[in-house]
Amino acid sequence: MSFVFQTQYQGDNPAVLIDNMDLFNELVRGSGSSGMLLFQQIAAGELTGLCVAASFWDSVQEGWDGLSAMYADPRIQEIATSANAPTAVGRNVTKLEREHGKPGPGYAGWTSFQGDSVNDEEFANITAIADRNGITAIRMLNNMAAGSNSGTRTAVFYCDSLNNWAEMMAELTTDPSFIAGASRTGFVPVARGLAIVH
């Protein structure tokens, strides 16, 4: 079982975060994380401009302990108190329910939704459509501790070009098997966005 801590940052200079991703990864991996990615929201309604630092852990406690150790590092404290440092404005904990491919830098399109988790057959259909359209990885997450969004789910589609995401969405949302699965699970999208992944 894997969990993701998602810390949201707001500020005028995302380069402070982007330029220090190697250090952040060094520190969280030293505490047992499989790594950290930064999602710079570029088209996400009211979330546009936010950066979300997502770190991946084997347990919730390990995640919190690992992040606490990172925040206590003098190098991180120096970054956090610098004049242009973004401010942490929120944090979510999610549980990984489905995965396909290996996520990495590039782009991501995400959809938050209400409804049950997809079954094996439904996920296989989604991954086949994604693969045909150049999607490099998929993660489906259960938003466990996410304020008013708790109990929803999020599907994240990683890609090398935003065109991959757009083409995949066009096929997926008109696919009869996907539509049938959406009816079975009670799928209702509540938010959608695009991000640069660092």
Q: Model-found features: residue ranges?
A:
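Short S/T/G/P-rich N-terminal loop/turn motif that feeds into the first structured element of a domain
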Residues: 1-198
